[in-house]
Amino acid sequence: MTRPASVLAGPKSRPPIHSQGDKTIEYAEKLLSVFILVPFAGSLIAIFFPSDQRGAISWFAGAIALVCFLVTAGLYPYVASGGVLHYRIDWVPELGLNFTLRMDGFAWLFSALITAIGVLVALYARYYMAEEDPVPRFFALFLAFMGSMLGVVLSGNLILLAVFWELTSIVSFLLIGYWHHNAHARDGARMALTITGTGGLAMFVGLIIIGKIVGSYELDAVLASGDAIRNHPLYGTVLVLVLLGALTKSAQFPFHFWLPHAMAAPTPVSAYLHSATMVKAGVFLLVRFWPVMAGTEAWFWIVGLAGLTTLLLGAYFAIFQQDLKGLLAYSTISHLGLITVLLSLGSPLAAVAAVFHIVNHATFKASLFMAAGIIDHESGTRDIRRLGGLFHFMPITATLAMVASAAMAGVPLLNGFLSKEMFFAEAIETHLVNPLDTVTPYVATIAGMFAVTYSLRFIHGVFFGRPPADLPRKPHEPPRWMRAPLDFLVLACLVVGIIPAQTIGPFLHTAVLSVLREGTPDYSLSVWHGWNIPLIMSFVALSGGIGLYFLMRSYLATAVEGPPVFRLLQGQRIFERVLVTLSWKWARWLEQRLGTRRLQPQMRLLVFLALAAGASPLLLGNFELPPLVIRGIDPAFALLWAIGIACAIGSAYQAKFHRLASLVLLGGAGLVTCITFVWLSAPDLAVTQLLVEIVTTVLILLGLRWLPKRIEEPVAAEDISIRVRLRRLRDLLLAIGAGGGMMLIAYTVMTRPLPETIASYFLERAYREGGGTNVVNVILVDFRGFDTLGEIAVLCIVALTVFALLLRFRPQSDSLEAPEQQKVQNAFDDDHPDRAAGDSVAEYLFIPAVIMRWMFPVTGMLAAFLFLRGHDLPGGGFAAGIAMSIGFILQYMSGGTRWVEERLRIHPLRWMSIGLLVATATGVGSWFFGYPFLTSHAQYASLPVVGKFPLASAILFDLGVFSLVLGATVLILIALAHQSVRAPRAHAKAARSDKEAVR
């Protein structure tokens, strides 16, 4: 999108949300945009750190997180009394997609958790990660995940929320699979991405429907439309879709099974993802939409049933885990179920308790994961059956872990006790008269008892009892700074548990006020509320949990991992069976019913479906064909197209047995198309078409070299079976139908009365606003730059896919044989003892090789020429990238793979990534001036000799296109060229090296 140069002189005006005199609020709002971009910028920088600089990169990541935390703390005064900070940039306003950031008290609380625990995890990871681990990749992903989570909690637009939501799924997939050499890590990452990603897509559909109901995707408008959403006929559909996203993210039943398998990630990842970030995103969404979707019976049943089941099963499963991280994973599932139950009740006090427990759980669970990591790091195992008596070896760590475990169990004078008491108090209240409401207090008490049992097992089974005898390493206290995050978190558990009103009270009130607004109830954070039913429930849970542990202690010390009743009912097994059924069994069934693995039946089916889809509306819609009008036809143009049609038909006819001839004819059809563009005054298209024809012809020729040979055997007409004749007739009819249909559609479109088009709009504004006279190029890189960005992203994906497919490809055995001409040349060398194998080849290619090497700088200059003139004359980044790739193709053809790669630094993946980043950064840069994404700036400069010439920021975008197109083409070229390196030489003497064979 383009703005005139005069408009771009100053920042975009926007009606201020606050008084214009309050400059500090305006600065605070602008700070939001910088605040959310800092982690992503840090992620890009972190990846370039050397692998051996573990300390430097950890301090860098910690500094990024600390800066974000300090900014969050500095913004608290603006939201403390119910205020809301906004920062908005129009992105794609036609679709309702704006880059809107919104910080209220609840978003502030989550931002503080994300950044504060991020600082502690960065410090902890400095000592946890091994020297051989790729630490730059870890911290780059860590910072990217921090930025993604901040994007989720600060999103003020539903579409933007969905974008960041899925980004958290993708980055968490990479973090969980960080140790990708481990099969468990790969499986856990795949499971997490599949479940949370699918739930996110369902949530995305629900958010779109909410936007349609409200009439806006802005979160402020949605939060003000609770009655409209709840009373809408699509409320049930929206509720299910949004809850699918929330329940899958927070590992609620029946989607809970992915979380324990995510424990294959490094412990710092577990401490971060499962305390303040990923799994909390689901309950964040429930709290965020609580004012507009809660309070209905459907909400109570769906959310409450999922939460109660998760609360009970998670606690029960945690008791029987033998892996420390597995125990903590299932306890996390249970506590998330507790929060979900609170949010299902529809009571404002329950919502307060839910927000409070989110904070409490983040502190004690992060500390427990860190303690488990220290035990694993210093002893070499996390198996509870092998541990015991560690208090004598690491007393400080043991004391800290015991306090955190007591907080998890809900022991008085710790933060977990306070929110658990609030949970019990709400559980005994009557919300809706139904069986689920009746059983809630009993389930809550039993789950609390189970929580005491698994917490006591963590304490007693690890730190007391018989000392360990066969540990991989002798246990000892960790480095001081590795334990420092644990010290801080446990201290927070103690301080909040003793003086909650003076510590967490103001921040909790700020968060609750932003969610409940005028419905905020009166509540107390006092440690002592007298003798009441919740206190009795706590006493029953504590005493019952202690008794249950000592009854089961001997069994748990030797038992197989997993609960006795549900040991065979494993979510992973069900998940794998579903995947196998969908991706293999059903695929094989469809393959048997619809065709074979051969390409021809598959293409036949695709053409038939396309023909049916295109013909159905024409046949059923009562369309009338336009009258056939034959106007004056230029004989030369008709002859040109007759040649092109003949080439196309000949190429298809010869494709099976005469591939080279078919390729030549295909190039002829492409050349006719190129001439047609010239004929119809489209030189830009003609230049691009010509360059693409050159490159694709050579690449296809390289690919044909490695296909199995096909020899045509003459068959008499009378020997062809009726079945074969019918099959050929069927294919002919399909081809005629599809081709005729396309011809009919083209004729209909071209003979319609020409309505008013947008061509005049582009013609009038291309030079004035885009700074270029080449309207086609200005459209591609300016007016429709967002489309071009998507297209080059697709090109990047295609190139990577081709490279991945050819990476393990090995040619057919019959394609390894040397060509006949090379056989003759090698035989001549064999007959002369004074000649080495390959001398004839080297002599034969010497002159072409020298000429092609001279052509390399020429093609480089041609590419630069096309690139620089593209804004005013035919050319541009795409054509320049193709032209530059021709230079590399010539070098590979003349010098061979090894010769070229020994002399040139060819990094196509780097070129592609730089191109995509430059193109995207060009669009993002416009945000800093208050304009929508990819808004360009154009002005004119004057030099003494050159004179007046245009300068447009779109040239940077075009540079990104050039880099990506060049990288993608060369990557495919390398994938094909490397087949010659992998394939063994048929001639024994020529097998010495590619270098000797072609130089």
UniProtKB/Swiss-Prot annotation:
One of its GO terms (cellular component) is plasma membrane. InterPro entries: CPA3_Na-H_Antiporter_A, CPA3_sub_B, MnhB, MrpA/MnhA1/PhaAB, MrpA_C/MbhD, MrpA_C/MbhE, ND/Mrp_TM, Proton_antipo_N. Residues 1-20 are annotated as: Disordered. GO terms for biological process: potassium ion transport; proton transmembrane transport. Its main location: membrane. The keyword Ribonucleoprotein does not apply. It comes from the Bacteria. It is found in: Cell membrane. It is a multi-pass membrane protein. Keywords: Antiport, Cell membrane, Hydrogen ion transport, Ion transport, Membrane, Potassium, Potassium transport, Transmembrane, Transmembrane helix, Transport. The keyword Membrane applies. GO terms for molecular function: antiporter activity; monoatomic cation transmembrane transporter activity. The chain crosses the membrane at residues 31-48, 63-85, 106-128, 138-160, 162-181, 191-213, 233-255, 270-292, 299-321, 336-358, 389-411, 442-464, 488-510, 530-552, 604-621, 636-653, 660-682, 686-708, 729-751, 788-807, 846-868, 878-900, 913-935, 955-977. In the N-terminal section; belongs to the CPA3 antiporters (TC 2.A.63) subunit A family. Part of a K(+) efflux system which is required for the adaptation of R.meliloti to alkaline pH as well as for the infection process during symbiotic nodule development. May form a heterooligomeric complex that consists of six subunits: PhaAB, PhaC, PhaD, PhaE, PhaF and PhaG. This is Probable K(+)/H(+) antiporter subunit A/B. The lineage of its organism: Bacteria, Pseudomonadati, Pseudomonadota, Alphaproteobacteria, Hyphomicrobiales. The gene is phaAB.
